[in-house]
Structures are given as C-alpha cells and as structure tokens.
C-alpha cells in the first residue's frame, strides 16, 4: 500500500454511506451495460458491484479526499463496449486493490443531449465530455481538485495499469509543484515509431 494514497477502508466506508444517502432503493449490478439505467454508478469493491447512487440533481462531485477514476459511457457507443472488456476485468482484478481510489461510471445514451438522468447529463456538460469513452482522473483534496487528467478513447488493460495505477504518484507529484507528464497513449507511441521510420526512409532516398 502506498503510504500517501489514502485509506481504502475509510473510502469504502464513505462510499457505502454515500450510496445509502443518495438513493432509497439502490440498483446494484455486476457490470454497467447498455440496458442499465442512466445515471451515476460507484464501484463497491467489497461486494464487487456497481451501485447506481444518483439519477437526479446536480453533476457528480467528489465527496471525499482521494483519487477518482470516472468512465463516461454511452450506451450507443461501440468503442465503449470494446472498452468494457478491459475496464471491468481491470477494476475487478487490479483496480479494487488500489488504496484511496474511487471508481465511477457516468452513463447516458448519447452524451448530455440524449440522457434519461439529469445528474449524468449535467456531469457530461460540467466535465466537458465530447468523446466516448472518456476516462477522467481526478485528485480531490479538501474540497478542491488538485490535479486531473482526461484520456479520450478506448484504453487497453496495459494502458489502464499505467494511466490509472500510477495516477496516485503523478497527482502527488503535481501537488508538490513538480512537473508532471501524463503517460503517452499506445497510439501515440505507434505514431512516433511510424514517423521515425518514415524519416529514416526519407533520409535514405
């Protein structure tokens, strides 16, 4: 356990209290999918379930100090269904073990304009989400967002390990005022390799 990444037991306790506070009858699912009600889901690591905690009201706000990983999901998004195949196994097998992390899914049909959940729609608008899937990472402390990253598009499981797993360290580094460079995406690495090859070929001609 990273000594500075928060108390996972305390986070779980707050999550459990929050789910009770925000919804009288909590919808719980093993995985959020195309037939799931639109709204804001929080992962309950203890029971390996996603709890629908909010459908009405304002946009999602971090509710305690910690590291938030928010997946903006659209039911009409084919890339989201591909992402699900890496996202859910990663959370279940690896993400749930990360101390101080809170995993969230915000589900609509098609962004803010086609959504049966007021809270989810407002969340898409507030966080300026225009691509799906989008994974937003937030470090929240003392009522403020200290550091955040937005990753648009499908992430592989290896990318999730790098981007999510090490977010804690990048966020704490940013808090100390140190320069932080978010990890490059796989496609960016592939483009760099391709450009280098093209430059090498151009130099030989």
Where are these regions (language model features)?
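Short amphipathic alpha-helical segments
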Residues: 87-92
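Thiol-based oxidoreductase modules, predominantly thioredoxin-like and allied folds used
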Residues: 72-74, 97-118
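Extracellular/periplasmic catalytic domains that process cell-envelope and extracellular macromolecules
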Residues: 62-64, 127-131
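N-terminal "domain-start" segment that seeds a small globular fold
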Residues: 1-59
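Short active-site neighborhood of thiol/selenol oxidoreductases, capturing the structured segment around
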Residues: 60-76
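Conserved redox-active cysteine motifs that mediate thiol-disulfide chemistry
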Residues: 72-86
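Short, low-complexity, charged amphipathic interaction modules
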Residues: 183-205
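Non-catalytic, surface beta->alpha helical segment in thiol-disulfide oxidoreductase systems
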Residues: 130-188
């Amino acid at each position: 356990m990273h000594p500075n990444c928060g108390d996972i037991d305390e986070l779980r306790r707050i999550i459990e209290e929050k789910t009770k506070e925000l919804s009288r009858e909590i919808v719980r699912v093993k995985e959020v999918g195309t037939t799931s009600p639109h709204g804001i889901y929080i992962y309950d690591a203890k029971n390996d379930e996603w709890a629908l905690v909010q459908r009405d009201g304002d946009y999602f706000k971090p509710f305690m100090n910690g590291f938030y990983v928010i997946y903006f999901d659209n039911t009409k998004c084919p890339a989201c269904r591909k992402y699900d195949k890496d996202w859910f196994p990663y959370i279940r097998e690896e993400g749930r073990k990360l101390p101080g992390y809170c995993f969230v899914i915000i589900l609509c049909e098609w962004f803010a304009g086609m959504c049966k959940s007021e809270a989810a729609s407002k969340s898409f608008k507030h966080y300026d989400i225009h691509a799906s899937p989008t994974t937003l990472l937030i470090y929240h402390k003392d009522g403020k967002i200290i550091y955040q990253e937005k990753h648009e598009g499908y992430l592989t499981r290896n990318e999730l390990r790098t981007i999510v797993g090490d977010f804690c360290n990048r966020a704490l580094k940013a808090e100390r005022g140190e320069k932080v460079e978010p990890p490059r995406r796989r496609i960016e690495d592939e483009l760099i390799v391709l450009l280098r090859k093209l430059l090498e070929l151009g130099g030989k001609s």
